[in-house]
Amino acid sequence: MSLQEKFDAAVEIIQKLPKTGPVATSNDQKLTFYSLFKQASIGDVNTDRPGIFSIIERKKWDSWKELEGVSQDEAKERYIKALNDMFDKIAEELDVAAWLEQIDPVIKTNLALIGK
């Protein structure tokens, strides 16, 4: 399986995660996944920094800007690793296999594709 296919599977997992419940991403995790996604998909920041009153957009832009110079492939690898690390931590407190039986089957399939 190619890096792009693994990355696409990882992105779909993040998009399909429930918004609430035992496996919900924190704001910091969301920011990490956002910036890695942008770097992996587009490359270096290609827009102006949002104004001071656009707090959320500015945080997102700053997080992406921090990845300047990271290759798109490296950003894809980091995205997948961040997702794997997140599930490793979740597995310390939750029966992930049982949880996976209760949610969108695509998540379980895609976790297998990225090596979980």
UniProtKB/Swiss-Prot annotation:
Superkingdom assignment: Eukaryota
UniProt xrefs under InterPro entries: Acyl-CoA-binding_prot_CS (IPR022408), Acyl-CoA-binding_protein (IPR000582), Acyl-CoA-binding_sf (IPR035984), FERM/acyl-CoA-bd_prot_sf (IPR014352)
Single GO MF annotation: fatty-acyl-CoA binding
PROSITE patterns, alphabetized: ACB_1 (PS00880), ACB_2 (PS51228)
CDD domains, per the entry: ACBP (cd00435)
Gene Ontology terms: biological process: fatty acid metabolic process; lipid storage
Listed Gene3D superfamilies: 1.20.80.10
GO CC, one annotated term: cytoplasm
Residue ranges of domain ACB in the record: 3-92
Classification via SUPFAM superfamilies: Acyl-CoA binding protein
Keywords carried by this UniProt record: Lipid-binding, Transport
A Pfam family recorded for this sequence: ACBP
Residues reported to bind an acyl-CoA: 34-38, 60, 79
Family stated for the protein in its record: Belongs to the ACBP family.
Functional note: Binds medium- and long-chain acyl-CoA esters with very high affinity and may function as an intracellular carrier of acyl-CoA esters.
Protein's name in the database: Acyl-CoA-binding protein homolog 3
Originating organism: Caenorhabditis elegans
Gene this protein is translated from: acbp-3
